[in-house]
Swiss-Prot record:
One of its GO terms (cellular component) is bacterial nucleoid. It is found in: Cytoplasm, Nucleoid. Pfam families: RdgC. Belongs to the RdgC family. May be involved in recombination. Keywords: Cytoplasm, DNA recombination. This is Recombination-associated protein RdgC. The gene is rdgC. It comes from Shewanella sp. (strain ANA-3). One of its GO terms (molecular function) is double-stranded DNA binding. InterPro entries: RdgC. GO terms for biological process: DNA recombination; regulation of DNA recombination. Signal peptide: none annotated.
Amino acid sequence: MWFKNLTLYRFNKPFSIETEALETALADFTFSPCGSQDVSKFGFSNALGKQGSTLVHSANNRHLICVTKEEKILPGQVIKESLEEKVAQIEDEENRKLAKKEKDALKDEIITSLLPRAFSRRSQTRALILPELEMILVDSSSATKAEELLALLRKALGSLPVIPLSFKAPVEANLTQWLKDGSAPLPFEMQDEAELKSAADEGGIVRFKQQDLKEDEVLAHLETGKEVHKLALHFGQSIALLLQSDASVKRLKFSEEFRAGNDELGNEDPMARLDADFALMGSELVALMHALVSALGGLEETQA
């Protein structure tokens, strides 16, 4: 349940919803496994996984939701070889070349025949709806997966007025200034990893890992016009993260000390522990968002 990445969105119109209403809306779009002829299936599933029983898990008016996607695995090479074999057989028997339309129809037939025997894979993506911040945080490093989740949520609710999070000043401008200053605004602390890019479209990219970012070797690249597009940070003592110029957060990791905050509850009641951990995570992510918006100079104004 602990989030590992953040793709960030904000509401551009006032938004609020009660847990029960959200649960009811999602219920019409619950996940069901692939049938024999399904290529993929996508829908909402229990927010807390196997331990949970609801599509929405809420605490302090913060709502956790989850989508599950199942996809049949059909190797392209297998389809290609089967198609070539079938085309060659028919062309030999009928002594003619098949048209593209005929080949496409054969390909569809092959896929249909392979689907019932194909393996499948499942993936899950969670999101945290934060009405207090007018934000949605999606636990995914993929913008495509985040947009898939939001598209299904929009379909379930009828409308979902969200846009990607954007700031008054370019994120890379702030990250570059922090590197020049040798420190990030509190409560953030720079770590030992960064990626610098030239402002030119075809300019160079330089990556530093396990390196003191205050050294002249690093700063020299700023003098040549490069900007910081990725920067490893600590948020207080609780979270390590990699902040990117598109305002996404990768490699989000809560410290062991922070995660141990509910250890006194034990694990005898898994649901009670999950509920407490969710409340703990939600509160810290809200604090992180407040600090991030402040450190980056505020959000860009939106048209209501």
